[in-house]
């Protein structure tokens, strides 16, 4: 009987415990975190722990810190506990209640309970721009450009006027190309004001102003144009009598859509003799000059003969923008 039983059974596989390194080796642990816990649903808590809007619990696992939040619409959301700005943790508490929004303790970037970015710190820009009352201005004209260049070259071109005497004969008649009064560098924007040459009143095809000053402007604000690049994709140009903006939409590394919009005060737009073609034509011409040279820059950079060149002292804002991009490209996901 024993011999018969022995011949009818297959040899058993010896089952053993895991090797010691499965419990003690940091590299093994890291693989478990990445391939097991980070890729599967985890038991994080009970729904009744989040019994009101803004209630949250924090869970730290597999190299991530996650905020699980009851949103205003009653849904439950999970957000990385990381600010998009500089990576600061949004909350160090294990549980609590957000009062309507989630605000980073570092630079006050503010998010909705649903995770949407609601506000980003722009330093003193809101107070600086308050006299223009941009919220009161109304859109009069819009032009969309399809430009064969990298989006960063558009920002860099906007941030200096050393090219103005060569590329922009009309603009160069309005400003002195070395006349920029730049504000101190900031992390999320750069820019400043440029005064007019004698006899120039605004940026138009002939330098004449055909509209009243914007109501909130006084003194020096009536005598300059403010140029600000607000990172990453907004170019704001404020004149004594109107506002021109450019929104940058990268499509691929060598193609960018640029949307230019001209805004005026509604009281001016209601007038029977209201005109805006002088401002639109001025900037459409100037913009196209910029887009053409930006396309040529991209072609040159795409050549195998390209090597990075030095910035001059008057191109510091371009370097600052480069650092803004590099800091985010090089940060950990």
Label every model-predicted segment.
Residues 1-10, 127, 330-333:
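Basic/polar N-terminal segments that are highly enriched at the extreme N-terminus
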Residues 16-18, 22-61:
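Non-catalytic accessory segments flanking enzyme active sites
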Residues 32, 82-83, 154, 290:
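Short hydrophobic core segments
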Residues 49-127:
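Rieske [2Fe-2S] iron-sulfur-binding domain
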Residues 70, 75, 118-333:
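C-terminal catalytic domain of Rieske-type non-heme iron oxygenases
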């Amino acid at each position: 009987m024993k011999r018969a039983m022995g011949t009818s059974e297959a040899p058993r596989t010896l089952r053993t415990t895991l090797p010691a390194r499965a419990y003690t080796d940091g590299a093994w642990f890291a693989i478990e975190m990445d391939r097991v816990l980070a890729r599967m649903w985890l038991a994080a808590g009970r729904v009744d722990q989040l019994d009101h809007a803004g209630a949250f619990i924090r869970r730290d696992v597999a190299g991530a810190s996650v905020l699980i939040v009851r949103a205003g619409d009653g849904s439950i959301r999970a957000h990385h506990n990381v600010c998009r700005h500089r990576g600061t943790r949004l909350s160090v508490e294990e549980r609590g209640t957000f009062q309507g929004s989630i605000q980073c303790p570092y630079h006050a970037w503010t998010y909705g309970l649903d995770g949407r970015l609601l506000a980003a710190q722009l330093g003193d820009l809101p107070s600086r721009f308050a006299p223009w009352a941009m919220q009161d201005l109304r859109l009069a004209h819009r032009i969309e450009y399809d430009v064969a260049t990298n989006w960063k070259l558009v920002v860099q071109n906007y941030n200096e006027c050393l090219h103005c005497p060569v590329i922009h004969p009309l603009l160069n008649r309005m400003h002195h190309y070395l006349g920029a009064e730049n504000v101190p560098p900031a992390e999320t924007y750069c820019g400043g004001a440029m005064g007019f040459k004698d006899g120039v009143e605004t940026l138009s095809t002939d330098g004449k102003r055909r509209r009243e000053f914007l109501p909130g402007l006084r003194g020096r604000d009536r005598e300059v144009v403010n140029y600000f690049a607000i990172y990453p994709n907004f170019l704001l140009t404020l004149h004594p009598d109107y506002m021109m903006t450019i929104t940058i939409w990268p499509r691929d590394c060598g193609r960018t859509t640029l949307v230019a919009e001209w805004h005026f005060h509604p009281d001016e737009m209601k007038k029977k003799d209201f005109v805006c073609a002088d401002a639109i034509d001025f900037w459409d011409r100037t913009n196209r000059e910029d887009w053409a040279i930006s396309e040529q820059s991209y072609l040159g950079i795409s050549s195998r003969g390209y090597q990075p060149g030095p910035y001059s002292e008057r191109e510091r804002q371009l370097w600052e923008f480069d650092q803004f991009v590099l800091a985010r490209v090089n940060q950990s996901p």
